[in-house]
């Protein structure tokens, strides 16, 4: 039973470690995952095409208003948006569904492993640590595999496609729009590590609370025999106050991070309005191009 005495594996501290841990489970659904990513790619391609259609429509109307032309571009936009919505639905259905399946498999494997462990393992290591891994930790893994991977891929592909189109139309205006990008990267690096650390502290505190609840329930008769209900209640309240404080600390940091990020991205929008408006008045770009750039900036902000 020597193998039973190994402590619970430490939580992954980096995204790469978390991906390596989850990959054997994710590989079971690689075909579905590939299908979901294909739907994501198609959705992003259609989304990137919409501003181009808007640009063509605005420029064509600038040459002379024709109802048939307006209706044609409007119908094309509606059709592209509808197909994009279908791909987006398929993307979420498949990728989020796979994350639920992976979570289900992990829970089953964890439980199957736990029932084979010896009593010495249970005696040596806190039950709360195991409970935390079976609840909060697995939920976090599911969020990383599902929404985490999906939103990361979606944002990355949208950024590449939008910048590629913008560069082909007006590379100077694109460079101006991307001026705040290094500041955005620095903000993500600065806040990202701190948010991760505070999230880890929350997970650790949840483990402490789970252990305390299990120990209290197991020793309830002893607590009552020695009249320790009030001290135990006070200790449990202290643990919960600490848990709340750690969550508030994370919320405060997030409350600073997201406005800073939005402000930096909004600066890009402002630069496009200023530089693009100037180039429009000087006749260097068309009205459709100006509208297209602003549409792409709106996509990147959201």
Residue ranges and their predicted role:
Residues 7, 11-15, 38-39, 46-59, ...:
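Juxtamembrane helix-loop junctions of ABC transporter transmembrane domains
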Residues 77-84, 88, 181-189, 254-268, ...:
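Hydrophobic alpha-helical segments in the permease module
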Residues 28, 32-42, 150-202, 272-285:
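Transmembrane helices of ABC transporter permease
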Residues 20-23, 31-52, 56, 73, ...:
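Alpha-helical segments in transporter systems
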Residues 119, 124, 154, 161, ...:
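Short, conserved catalytic or interaction motifs in soluble domains
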Residues 12, 16-23, 27, 131, ...:
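Membrane-interacting alpha-helical segments
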């Amino acid at each position: 039973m020597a193998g039973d005495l190994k402590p619970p594996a430490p939580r992954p501290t980096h995204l790469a470690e978390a991906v390596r841990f989850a990959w054997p489970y994710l590989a079971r659904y690689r075909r579905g995952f590939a299908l979901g990513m294909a739907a994501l790619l198609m959705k992003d391609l259609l989304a990137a095409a919409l501003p181009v259609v808007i640009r063509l429509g605005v420029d064509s109307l600038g040459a002379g208003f024709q109802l048939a032309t307006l209706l044609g571009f409007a119908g094309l936009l509606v059709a592209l948006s509808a197909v994009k919505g279908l791909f987006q639905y398929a993307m979420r259905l498949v990728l989020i569904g796979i994350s639920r399946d992976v979570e289900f498999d992990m829970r089953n494997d964890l439980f199957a492993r736990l029932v084979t462990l010896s009593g010495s393992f249970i005696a040596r290591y806190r039950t709360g640590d195991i409970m935390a891994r079976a609840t909060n930790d697995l939920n976090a893994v599911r969020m990383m595999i599902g929404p985490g991977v999906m939103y990361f891929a979606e944002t990355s592909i949208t950024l590449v496609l939008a910048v590629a189109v913008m560069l082909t139309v007006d590379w100077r205006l694109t460079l101006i729009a991307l001026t705040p990008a290094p500041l955005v990267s620095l903000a993500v690096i600065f806040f990202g590590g701190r948010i991760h650390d505070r999230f880890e502290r929350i997970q650790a505190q949840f483990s402490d609370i789970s252990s305390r609840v299990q120990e209290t329930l197991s020793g309830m008769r002893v607590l009552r025999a020695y009249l320790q209900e009030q001290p135990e209640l006070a200790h449990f309240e202290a643990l919960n106050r600490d848990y709340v404080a750690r969550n508030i600390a994370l919320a405060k940091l997030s409350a600073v991070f997201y406005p800073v990020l939005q402000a930096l991205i909004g600066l890009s929008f402002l630069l496009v309005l200023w530089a693009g408006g100037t180039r429009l008045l000087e006749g260097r770009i068309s009205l459709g191009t100006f509208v297209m750039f602003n549409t792409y900036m709106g996509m990147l902000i959201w």
